[in-house]
A protein has these predicted regions:
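PLP-dependent aminotransferase class I/II
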Residues: 39, 218-281
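Structural signal for conserved beta-strand scaffold positions within catalytic alpha/beta enzyme cores
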Residues: 14, 28, 84, 112, ...
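Structural scaffold positions in well-ordered secondary structure
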Residues: 29, 159, 194-196, 222, ...
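A general structural signal for well-ordered alpha-helical segments in protein cores
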Residues: 9, 39, 43, 63-67, ...
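Conserved core of the PLP fold type I
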Residues: 54-185, 192, 197-216
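Glycine-rich beta-alpha junction loops
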Residues: 33, 165, 226
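N-terminal "arm"/small-domain region of PLP-dependent enzymes with the aminotransferase-like
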Residues: 1-57, 155
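Short acidic/glycine-rich loop or secondary-structure boundary segments that cap or lie
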Residues: 37-38, 168, 196, 200-201, ...
Length: 281
């Protein structure tokens, strides 16, 4: 046994690594990627854009341009801020970091329905938070009573609600979500509405946030450009009231989004109709 392993956390050594299976010769459905490539004309235009990027420089003003473009794309509500992540995975990790109190006797908790996105639990574990998964009902419906009981018992720092759910595709009942959000608000917890699959959905919780901002003051809304059609560039974004997003953004590593990724995203946002047509298929 390598002696240096004694300094690697036991819980990390006990974990199984997240493995991406090779998909050569297979119809790959598990990752829900956009199967369409860009037209030759758009590929050429994107190539020209990327060729002009100053890759000798650290990311700068173009990151701000991207944030502004995304804010315009989602019609960011007044008083809200927006931050970028290297995929939603990084944003989930930053949320766990923000809520993990070093040396705390009572560990912060994370609650989410299961089956759900694996990174909720994995990021919680890696940051020393306790993860509580709440099983869905037999028909994959959200078990409101069980979720409410878990929230009452554990008072989690974070409650994740995927809208629609990954991997079951459920779009949870809005009244149920409102009640859970109100319950979490009573003790000061956070609710993260994960809208990774919003391009395939007929609804967005952002409309609810606009209509009832006070009731959603502790809600963060997270999205990714992966299901938009850009899984290869690894770009997620999260929006919330400015005071809240500013605290999470303090933990973001500098230059976490590359200039090439930012330019790809800006190009895509200039051609949203193309990606919307692909998602509709």
């Amino acid at each position: 046994t390598n002696k240096a392993l004694r300094f690697i956390r036991p819980d990390v050594q006990a974990m199984h690594a997240y493995v991406v299976q090779h998909s050569v010769g297979m119809v790959k459905l598990d990752a829900m990627e956009n199967p369409f490539t860009l037209s030759p004309e758009l590929q050429a235009k994107l190539g020209e854009r990327l060729g002009a990027v100053e890759i000798n420089r650290y990311p700068g003003a173009r990151i701000d341009d991207l944030k502004n473009a995304l804010a315009q794309y989602v019609d960011l509500p007044a008083g809200f801020g927006l931050m970028l992540g290297n995929g939603s995975d990084e944003l989930i990790s930053l949320l766990s970091q923000a809520c993990a109190v070093p040396g705390a006797q009572d560990r912060a908790k994370v609650v989410a329905p299961e089956p759900g996105f694996v990174m909720y639990g994995m990021s919680a574990q890696l940051q020393g938070l306790q993860y509580i998964g709440v099983p869905l009902q037999a028909d994959f419906a959200l078990d409101e009573a069980a979720m409410s009981a878990a929230i009452a018992q554990h008072e989690p720092a974070i409650v994740y609600i995927a809208y629609p759910n990954n991997p079951t595709a459920n779009l949870w009942d809005a009244d149920t979500i409102r009640r859970l959000i109100t319950q979490v608000s009573a003790y000061g917890g956070l609710v993260v509405m994960d809208e990774a699959y919003q391009p395939f959905s007929s609804k967005s919780w952002l409309d609810e946030i606009r209509q009832h901002p006070a009731a959603n003051a502790h809600v963060l809304l997270m999205r990714t450009l992966s299901k938009f059609g850009l899984a290869g560039i690894r770009l997620g974004y999260m929006l919330a009231p400015t005071a809240l997003i500013n605290e999470i953004d303090k933990l973001r590593p500098p230059y976490n989004v590359s200039v090439l990724n930012a330019e790809c995203a800006l190009f895509a946002l200039e051609h949203t109709e193309v990606f919307a047509q692909q998602a509709a298929v």
